[in-house]
Amino acid sequence: MTALTQPVRLPFVTTDLDVLLRQVAERDVDAFAALYDRTRSRVYGMVTRVLRDPGYSEETTQDIYLQVWRSAGSYDPKAGSPMAWLLTLAHRRAVDRVRSEEAASQRESRYGAASVDPPVDHVADSVILLDERRRVVDCMGSLSDLQREAIQLAYYEGLTYVQVSERLSANLATIKSRMRGGIRGLKNCLGMS
C-alpha cells in the first residue's frame, strides 16, 4: 500500500506563471493578459464557490486581478506556487466581499427598522380627536360665562393674559384667577385631576 504524499515544491524551480508574474510586476501588459487568460477560470471558480452570485463573482474577480496588477511584485516564489498565491488572494477577497455584504445588510436592516414610521389609522385618530373635542366643548359648557370667555380668548384666539385683560376690561389678576378656575374646572370635568 502506498502512502499519499503532498506534492513538494522544489525551491527555485520556475514555471511560466512565475515568469508571467515577474513580468506583470514590471508592468508588462501582454504578460498580464496571458496570466489572466491562463488563470481566470480557476480564480472565478473559487470566487463563485464562496459568493454564489455570478454578478458579485465577476466584480470580485475583476478586483482580484486589479490587485494582482498592483501587487505582483509582492509574490514570493519561495512561499508557494503562483496559482496558490492567486487562489489565496481570490479566497480572501471573496470572503471580504461576503462580510461586507452582510455588514451592509445589517446596517440597512437597522436603519430601516429605525426609520419606518408605524402605520397610522387616520380614521381612528379622527374619531378620537372628534370625541376629545366634543368632551372639551361639553366641559366648557360647565364653566361660568366669565371663565369660558377668558379661556376661549387665551387658548382659541391665542391672546396673552394681558391682551385678554384689555379685551375684557378686567384686572390682570382677575383674568388669571378666572383662567386658573376655568382650567381646574376643565380638568375635573375631563377626569384629569
UniProtKB/Swiss-Prot annotation:
Look up the DNA-binding region in the UniProt entry and give its residue ranges. Answer: 161-180
Keywords from UniProt, A to Z, are: DNA-binding, Sigma factor, Transcription, Transcription regulation
| Single Gene Ontology MF annotation | sigma factor activity
InterPro entries, per this entry? RNA_pol_sigma-70-like, RNA_pol_sigma-70_dom, RNA_pol_sigma70_r2, RNA_pol_sigma70_r4, RNA_pol_sigma_r2, RNA_pol_sigma_r3/r4-like, WH-like_DNA-bd_sf
> A biological process (GO) annotation for this entry?
DNA-templated transcription initiation
Described by its record, this protein's role is as follows: Sigma factors are initiation factors that promote the attachment of RNA polymerase to specific initiation sites and are then released. Extracytoplasmic function (ECF) sigma factors are held in an inactive form by an anti-sigma factor until released by regulated intramembrane proteolysis.
Quote the protein name from its UniProt record: ECF RNA polymerase sigma factor SigK
Native source species: Mycobacterium sp. (strain KMS)
